[in-house]
Amino acid sequence: MKIGGKLLEHKTGGRSRYWQVFWLCFAVAVALFLPHCIIDGLNGDFFHYAGDFNDQQISFYSYANNFVKQGGSFSWATDLGSGFVNSYSFYLCGSPFFWLTLLLPYRWTPWAMVPMLCLKFAVAGGGAYLWMRRWVKDERWSMVGACLYAFSGFTVYNVFFNHFLDVVALFPYMLKALDDAVLDRRHGAFPFWVAVNLLNNYFFFAGQAVFLMIYFVCMVAGGRYKLNLRLFGALAFQTVLGCCMGCALLVPAALSLVQNPRTIDPFNGYGYLVYGSAQQYLAIFYSAFLMPDAPYLKDLFQEGILKHTSMTVYLPVVGIAGGLVFCRVRRRHPFARIMKVCLICAFVPVLNSMFYALNSSYYARWYYMPVLVLCAATAMTLQKANLCETEYRRALGLVALCTLSSIAFALVPNEKDGTTTIGVVEEPLRYWGILLVSMLGVGLFWLLLHYRRQLAARFPAAVLSVVLGFSFVYGQVHLSITKYGQWYHDADYVQQTWREAPELNAVLPDDVFYRLDAYDSYNNLGLWLDKSCIQFFNSTVAPSILEFYPTVGVKRDVNSKPEASLYALRGLLSVRYTLVPKEKVEDWEKEKLEGWNLVSSTTSYLIYENENWVPMGFTYDSYITEEDFETVSDTNAGNVLMKALLLTDEQVERYGQMMQNLTDDEKNNISYEDYVQDCTARRESAVTSFTATRTGFTAQADLEAENLVLFSVPYDDGFTATVNGVPAEVEKVDNGLMAVAAPAGHSEIVFTYHTAGLRQSVAVSAGAIVVYAVWVAVLHRKKRREESSVG
């Protein structure tokens, strides 16, 4: 790739080079992924990576593509069933990159993941360039800074999470629009980019709002922003307008998240001020000097919260040398203050958590914002020849020293289990490789500085060439460590998901509703089949799922993974088939589970049918109170819930006459034989038909007497129900499932799901868009009048 000539011709304040940066970043991203695409392609597979990228991102994009085109509000394939908007707005619903993939058939979506990744790298670089060119006098160095941002350690690391790159790509445009609004009084773009970023990801937008406040205060304090009351009011109006335009998904998400225990995790005591492990501080420190390791691995440090945190501020070649120089020579500049404030935030837990609504769970997923400022500071100092001669050499020496100091952890004596070894790193070979690549970057930068005078006017082009070339090298190392570290585990991923799905659907019956179980298979198999599966990986499912599962012996954080030993849950949740990968059959047989019969097979799976399957929707002869249920162990809870319906005291008063209170003797009869009898009883009391729809479900029941009908569907405020056309109360039973009272005789039961808050938030968004359109038209007319008067 030739970099020079007209591409990097020195122009200050001249023609924008946005598209040059865009295509340059796109080309390097293509080169970065191409070798891995070829390797996967040789097996006839699309690019698959590791961890969340495979388990969530590919399946989410493919499933959502199909779901959106078919329409609907309720997703049966999402765990036990969840509202589509609330389950996927964090991941993709508001992403412009996802909506681009709707141009393709859903079966093609996995093949579009890499082109979308390349596009995100390009959009990120282009946006960073547009923002930086105001602050960096030389256009050539603006391009360098933009490419540093596009290929920062944060960006490369978060390929693993895919949708995080949407945020990285779009944020610089909002920051540029803020500068334009304050410094140039160009007000039209800021509300638009606020709306785009909020719609794209409400969770990350919370952190962006905090960073923008830090940025704004530092810019005012540093004298860059000159404010008056009128301008401040205009900015407040634009901010509110942008938030209103982008709030279409915010209200439904907020209503769901406030019920999600993962989002309500406050600090306590020392937790506000200090991390629980000293190694956490060391990990944060070295994240600036060493290229990032695979997100799912620990190497240099073992204690603390280190995996999947996005903890890296690494910049290819230049590292943080530019930031050190900038903070030394321009210490009063707002950028220096911003970087110092962010540094303090990184080391103080409660300040770090400001970017995540004060949640105590540790993440560093806001680092991309100070990284953008760091890239600009680097470009601003590199364009000063005198700094390259003096300050940069000292800063680079300090960076080299800090990077090499990590060797101490590879050489310190370590005694474990009576054996003394050298070093505390988990995988010495991987550590030395990471150190070698990191020091290669330092060495290349030293050479660039050493030959700066000889390069003269070609120095910016040389730096850009080396940055992009090294980004390819270290990016390849990182992608390879991450991808091939799970190579054997993920070798059959495409075959057992995307390729196998049509074959499985051809074998599995579709004449009646049922759920699936998947024994030790790849995550989210149900999404590929568009069927409900009790094994599921998604953080933002219906909150009732997170309430229900822990009460029946299932840990529910980001995954639903009921163990095979909890056999009674399969009856309660209407699981009819278990899919067992053929290489896992031996482990499955060791479980020695009763009641499962091999009925079919496909290329990769054996299919076992549950002879104790209970259709969806059934009644009980007994109920159990919350007080009595608390005495039941979690492992036996499923057995008890097959005997009796769990009711609150208030529900007992209203519906207790329909059933008998479960006796202690009955509660203690929890053998497998008792379970079989309970399944038979529930099956005999089941509704005569059940149909899952894209907006809920319908059922027909013929009851001998009035009773509550349980549906093992997560309770959600968005559900309304009618029985024989008459509105009915939806009851929350069994710590998170739904039931409705039906009279004796024949009943038509209809549950309809409307995403709570969606209609109102869309109305606010639509109204704000109208206001925005009128406002922009007024601004445009005013500008034309001013131009006419000047002419």
Predicted regions and their residues:
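Periplasmic/ER-lumenal interhelical loops and adjacent helix-loop junctions
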Residues: 52-64, 96, 232, 239-329, ...
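Active-site lumenal/periplasmic loops and adjacent helix-entry segments of GT-C-fold
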Residues: 35-172, 196-200, 283, 294-307, ...
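Hydrophobic alpha-helical membrane-insertion signals
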Residues: 3-86, 483-523, 527
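Contiguous transmembrane helix-bundle modules in multi-pass membrane proteins
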Residues: 185, 204, 335-496, 744-791
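Active-site-proximal, structured, solvent-exposed surfaces of multi-pass membrane proteins
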Residues: 11-14, 60, 653, 657-791
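Membrane-interface helix-loop-helix junctions at transmembrane boundaries of multi-pass membrane enzymes
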Residues: 225-233, 322-346
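Membrane-embedded helix bundles of polyisoprenyl
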Residues: 29, 117-134, 140-222, 234-254, ...
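Extracytoplasmic/lumenal acceptor-recognition loop(s) of multi-pass membrane glycoenzymes
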Residues: 466-492, 504-575, 613-675, 716, ...
